Each structure stands twice: as C-alpha cells, then as structure tokens.
C-alpha cells in the first residue's frame, strides 16, 4: 500500500461477513457520493444535506438488489476527511458482496486493509498513535483495555508527545539564540544549566510514561498465566471455574491434559491468558511427554504462575520440584480440595498461600485480589485521565529517546560544548516524532496499516 496520498474512491464491507441484522458497505473519496447515487433509487444523494440517512433501494438495471438506508457525510467532517457514504443493507454474505461489486463496477476501487484509517492519518485527522488505538479498541478484551484504547484514540498520548517535542524545540531554539547572540559574559554556563535542567525534565517525563508500560502491556496483550501442578490436583477444574465454562477436559484419570490449553478470561478488567499445562512429571507416554515439555516452556514464559497443590494429600517430590522451579516467578500458591480433610504439611509451604475449593467455588475471588496486589500494588488498574504505554513500538521508541537524553547528560558531565550536544537532543525530538508518525518511515506506516481489517 503506497504511502502517497491517493484521491480515488475506495469501498469495502465494514461489517463481519456472515448472517446478521445489517451489513455496511462503506465508500470514501471524491466521487463517493456520485458513485453511490448511480445505484441508489430514492432521493438524489448529491443534493441531500450532509450527515443524513436516506431511505431507498440499491438497483441495477432497474432490478432491486436490496432495501437500504444510505448515510451521506460530506468532507471534511468525516472519519477520513473525505466524502463518505455508508450503505446499510440487510445482513448476509450474498447481498453485501453484490452491492460491493456493483459499487466497484460503478467506479470505486476495492480498499486495501486499513485504508480508511490510513486516509484519516494522511489527511491529518488522526496521528499514528490514534490510528493504532483504533486497532487496540477493536481487539480490546476487557472494559479496562477499552478505556485505555479510547483515551489514546482521544489523543492523550499524542498530546503528551507533541507537547514534549515542542518543549525540546523551544530548548534547542534557546540554545541557538544564546550561542549566536550572547547577551551575557557567562552565556556558556547559562546555556549549559538550561540544557541540563531541561534534559532532566524530559527524562523524568518519559521515565514516568515508561513506568506505565507494564500495566498497559498487560491490558493490551493479557497477563500470561500458567496453571501448574502435578497430575489430578484440579488444574483443569480451576481453569473451567475461572472461565465459568467447560473448556478443558476434566476427569479422574491422571495425565488427562496432555497438551497446553490457552483461554482468555476477564478478571476484574485484567485479560488473563490462562494456560492450563499438562502435569509436570516423568512419563514414558510420547504424547504426554511433549505436553510436559510444553508445560515447562509455558512456565518459563509466564507473567504469572498459579501453582495448584492438593491439600488432602501429603506433599510429594513432584510438588516440591514445582515449588522449587517456580520460586522466582510471580507465583500464587493454591491449596485446592479444602472441602476434604487436610493432609498436606503446610509448615513446608510459604505463608502467602490461598486455600481454595474449586468444587465448591470457595475463595476463588481471593485469587483475583492477589493478582491485583502482585501486579498493580492494590492501586487499581486504570487511573482516570492517565496516559498508558501499551504498544511495543511506542515502548521501544521511548527507550531510545531516553538513551539519547542520557547521551546529553553524559556529554554535560564530560564538559562537551553545548552545541555538540544538540545532535542528541535533536535525535530525541526525531525519535518521538516516529511515535506520532511525524517522522516515521513510509515503510513502517504502510506495514502498520496493513494489519487492519478490510473496511476499517
């Protein structure tokens, strides 16, 4: 997809294919209204007011294809800042595809993935962070993830980055003035102090922003959570309890879960990617052995480990092995089967364990509370009006910007002339511009929009 502005008219189906109450076919471009008008029988769309919905029929050769409502929105007050038409049809694969093909035959071009959002970016309606927020909003798995995406779409990150870039420019301009038109005998010292003060200010701001990355990444991608334990301690039953549906096979036969099962669940706004692992033990079964190896790998990569022990049986060597290999992880130890007489030796266990009964659904809510304590310091997940980093691209660029600012600091410590340090500060300004798209390479922008679905 070319990064250059294109002014032809594009079209695509904007609703999921399949049976449904309605389908929407969208057009955007200079000829959007004229093309829609060619196939619409009703009011003259070229003369109706902007932002109106018009009843009529889509026809070809006087044959009615569907009864529709057509929305007409004139530039620049549209998502793309171009003329936009949305044809609201009855849902279904055949009718939406037929109308799409008719619009293409009438002069529109099939849109590429993300091209509507790309045009909104190229026409200056949104920046790159807001474009990425559109995708985050589509993919949000919980209300908290949605809140963060909406905040970014509303411009919270864009405004913070743009304000910081402007402050950097102001600092660079003041340095230039001080160097070219010195008003004081100690102008070099004054300029050095200015650069030092501003550099520390920018560092503090970006470090605070970077500190939100852990929380933001969890909201965007989910908290990878491995459920581990020896066979038949209730791992799959716990998974089903958290999911509140039967997703894993639960039996009384040891070794039933022979692979790794992954599911997402919303725990108080946190999207947990639950990984139910095969019981980790020595086995001669080839299939089960593969599952055990995958379980060990899942344990290494997990953000959180839920270690399930059977409180109705004494600790086994397998239990002790699991306690040992998971001790450096963010771990919650769960004593399951508290509905049965206790036989486990609790003196060998850490004090912060949680007794539960998956069978009777007892103390499951305490797992949720402990997760909040472990990852969010009981402070709540999303603070009102806060800006969060959740995108790996943004995080990487903020880290690079901080490296450039640190280079300025090191130069100051070494007594380097301030005019030489302008290079690193200018580099910081450029890196931050890559976040918003002001200085992003064409190839990057093209690649980002190609990840969108058709019609968005």
Curated annotation (Swiss-Prot):
It comes from Streptococcus thermophilus (strain ATCC BAA-250 / LMG 18311). It holds the Pfam family MMR_HSR1. K(+) binds at residues 232, 251, 253, 256. Its cofactor is K(+). InterPro entries: G_TrmE, GTP-bd, GTP-bd_TrmE_N, GTPase_MnmE, MnmE_dom2, MnmE_helical, P-loop_NTPase, Small_GTP-bd. This is tRNA modification GTPase MnmE. Its main location: cytoplasm. Belongs to the TRAFAC class TrmE-Era-EngA-EngB-Septin-like GTPase superfamily. TrmE GTPase family. Its EC number is 3.6.-.-. GTP binds at residues 232-237, 251-257, 276-279. Residues 222-376 form the TrmE-type G domain. Coiled coil: none annotated. Keywords: Cytoplasm, GTP-binding, Hydrolase, Magnesium, Metal-binding, Nucleotide-binding, Potassium, tRNA processing. One of its GO terms (molecular function) is GTPase activity. One of its GO terms (biological process) is tRNA methylation. Mg(2+) binds at residues 236, 257. Binds 1 potassium ion per subunit. Homodimer. Heterotetramer of two MnmE and two MnmG subunits.
